[in-house]
Amino acid sequence: MGSDALVLHDIDAFYGDSHVLHRVSLRLGEGRLLGLLGRNGAGKSTSMSVTVGLLPPRHGTIAVFGQAVTGRAPEGIAAQGVALVPQGRRIFKSLTVRENLAVAGRKPRTGGSTRWALDTIYELFPRIGERRRQIAGSLSGGEQQMLAIGRALMSNPRVLLMDEPSEGLAPLIVAEVMATIRRLKGQGLSIVLVEQNPKLVFQVADDIVILNSGRVVAEGPAAEFRDRDAELHQHLGIF
């Protein structure tokens, strides 16, 4: 522990002519959970797209465990141990649960912690195991989210990016998802959690970064934000 799992430094990103990220920097420590907060359109999901290579930055650098990955294709960044649970789940709805998981399988890197495979995913999410032969599109929203998380874990990542994992879920299912995140963190996985619900993030985060209009406007240990209510209200409209 103690090294940096993921570092974004001075990232500028554009959608066409629209400048959407302005010198964004964030640092995820190994085995830690970084909460990335901001209002709609603040740049949270864009930061995740840049990290996994879906949107190449025009300026700045990205490193995974000290290895530069700036400008690499998504496959190359995934090979370094980065996996994304995307907003909206984006499972393969015409495939079975098992097929969704199998297509994402990747051998774990040397020195990894948990070795994720079908049996360990089914142990983590028993309902997914019970429905392994079921077409994924017929699952409930909560089950689809579990499948999306399981699919990301099948790549045996060292860094897991989770973009709005509670979106559209009932409170009981949100509690299950958060319990899963705690378990993964407890196993030493390095996690970036993007959430619309800041109170969920503060339940599990070690560190916080707040974006506003594509810029980092606040950052620090999560515990420090307990006394920064005015700042949270200004940037997030809460507390």
Residue ranges and their predicted role:
Residues 37-39:
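The feature captures the beta-strand-to-loop junction immediately N-terminal to the Walker
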Residues 52:
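Helix-to-loop junction immediately C-terminal to a conserved catalytic motif
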Residues 16, 72, 97-116, 124-129, ...:
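ABC-type ATPase nucleotide-binding domains, specifically the catalytic core motifs of the NBD
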Residues 152-153:
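ABC ATPase C-loop
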Residues 60-69, 80, 114-118:
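Conserved ABC transporter NBD signature motif
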